[in-house]
Amino acid sequence: MKKNLYPTIAILCLVPFIMVLGNSMLIPVLPKIQEELHVGLVQVGFLITVFSIPAGIVIPFAGMLSDRIGRKKIMFPALLIYGIGGLLAGLFAILFKEKAFPWIIGARIIQGIGAGGTYQLGMALAGDLIQSNERSKVLGLLEAFNGLGKVVSPLAGAAIALISWYMPFFVYGVLAIPIGFLVLWVVSEDVKKLKQQVQPIPKYFGDLAKIFKSKGLALATAFLSGLLALFALFGLLSFFSDVLEKQFKISIFPRGLILGIPVLIMALTAYILGTVMQKQMTRILKWAAVIGLFMLAAGLILFCPFKNLWGLTIAASILGLGTGAVLPSLNTLITSSAPKTERGLVTCLYGTVRFFGVAIGPPLFGLAEKISKPPIFFTTAGICILAGVLFLFLVDPKKIIPKEIQS
């Protein structure tokens, strides 16, 4: 990789880090928010949902537009909107106190709209810049920073919430707005070359249709796998946070430390796998995704019978290990499935299904408190196993990833 790209890659790594704070930093604080705003577990889970659904809706439009005008022109205002939404949520909490819940929901929607133009465009830009087998390493690095954000955010959220439960909302603005300006001033992008490659709208969608016609089953399987990984991870973490508070009476900061264990394992796995895939990409990629999906299922199944803290943490860590194996494999597969002219939209469609997984995970897993764990946990595990089998038979990385990236 060219040395002049190092600052760009460093800034791009900050984008998934800040984006993942959007949900992960709130997870250990949800029980406290529940108490302060007098809402139930399912309701408080909607703080995650109303952030993730707008992000998921915006992502494909942001991707399509970025294919035509450039990635930075979307990422910069998106990061500003993301930060402003967080600042508004904190201000509403101060102004309206125990009646602030609907106002915070509105601010989270604004924040989600901003989030829709961040991480996936960072992935697409990394894919534009790295035209060699180093792409898997760089994408693994981005996913590792995404994972690092998931590790740091429960600890940061728990620590900052010791000041007040609404203080984590202000962190979004303090971090996202400066990072937005770094993207604008530091990140390099060949917009002139991108504009030369811009196609008329009918040809753009025609070429996109050809991609899905030739690789549709494989891409659909990859999209499903990404949705399941994030659905299971965020669903389990939000449920585990509630269990730690109510069943084990663990205070907010130690709770953040415990929740950080599975996501630390996920981040380390993503980074190591991204590095290893450089040497034997097509062989390792497929088996990493399949085994990762089976590990997701194993973590969910094991979480049900365990009653002690160690057992539950081990089960959650197995799920984290599986997520860390699945996501970098999917990132490389999907960013390499389309040429530069359509990469933004294809990558962002993948981001949409990831966000929908995050959106529905916490409220659906929250229902386990009212009914019981096995129906939700075992059903999700079964779908993960099915996705693993589909990936095994329907996805051939050699047919999807260009030869110059494989070698």
Predicted segments with their positions:
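Helix-to-loop junctions at the C-terminal end of transmembrane segments
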Residues: 59-71, 270-283
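Juxtamembrane intracellular "pre-TM" segments in multi-pass secondary transporters
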Residues: 1-2, 188-221
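Cytoplasmic helix-loop-helix junction between adjacent transmembrane helices
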Residues: 101, 107-146
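Helix-loop-helix hairpin linking two adjacent transmembrane segments in secondary transporters
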Residues: 141-187
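Conserved MFS/SLC helix-loop-helix module at the cytosolic interface between two early adjacent transmembrane helices
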Residues: 57-97
